Curated annotation (Swiss-Prot):
GO terms for cellular component: cytoplasm. The keyword Chaperone applies. One of its GO terms (molecular function) is protein-folding chaperone binding. The lineage of its organism: Bacteria, Thermotogati, Deinococcota, Deinococci, Thermales. CDD domains: GrpE. Pfam families: GrpE. Gene3D superfamilies: 3.90.20.20, Head domain of nucleotide exchange factor GrpE. This is Protein GrpE. InterPro entries: GrpE, GrpE_coiled_coil, GrpE_head. GO terms for biological process: protein folding.
Length: 177
């Protein structure tokens, strides 16, 4: 009888272990399916992100092209004006000067239309954000004494710094010794 009880206990234990193993197998299968689903979702998100990145790169290139085209379309009239000026190159020096001045003024209007403005020049305070000091000249200290090359900016973005000489107080020979 004791042996039978022992067998019954073993059978119950074995049955319990079998049920537990089956439950663990079901949980493992569910976890594997969940992992597969998450992996698929991850791969789709990765592909979506890669497609998004490519679209953004293409859009950026397209906008850059549009900007260049806009600038070129705005500048082509200057080329037309230069061609017309060359046709009249035989004219008097004064008429050539007037023509070049008109072309220059038109070019500045185009730059203004593109949002470009000239960096402040002579007599203005030297600003290292917009000016490149290339020398010193007698003049008011800290002020731009002479502009060698104009600078331009578009909003706060610097297109090209102005190359300038900055004023400094004139020193006496005795001060140098």
């Amino acid at each position: 009888m004791e042996e039978r009880n022992h067998e019954n206990t073993l059978e119950k234990d074995l049955e319990a272990v079998g049920q537990e193993a089956q439950a663990l197998e079901e949980r493992l299968k569910a976890a594997e399916e969940e992992l597969k689903g998450l992996k698929d979702k991850y791969l789709r998100l990765l592909a979506d992100f890669d497609n998004y990145r490519k679209r953004m790169e293409e859009e950026l290139k397209a906008r850059e092209r549009e900007g260049v085209l806009k600038a070129l379309r705005a500048l082509l009239p200057v080329l037309d004006d230069l061609d017309r000026a060359l046709e009249f190159a035989e004219a008097s020096p004064e008429s050539i000067r007037q023509g070049v001045r008109a072309i220059r003024d038109g070019f500045f209007r185009i730059l203004a239309g593109l949002g470009v403005e000239e960096v402040p020049g002579e007599g203005e305070a030297f600003d290292p954000r917009y000016h490149e000091a290339v020398g010193l000249l007698p003049g008011e200290p800290g002020k731009v004494a002479k502009v060698f090359q104009r600078g331009f900016r578009m909003g706060e973005a610097l297109v090209r710094p102005a190359r300038v000489a900055v004023g400094e107080e004139k020193r006496e020979e005795a001060d140098l010794e």
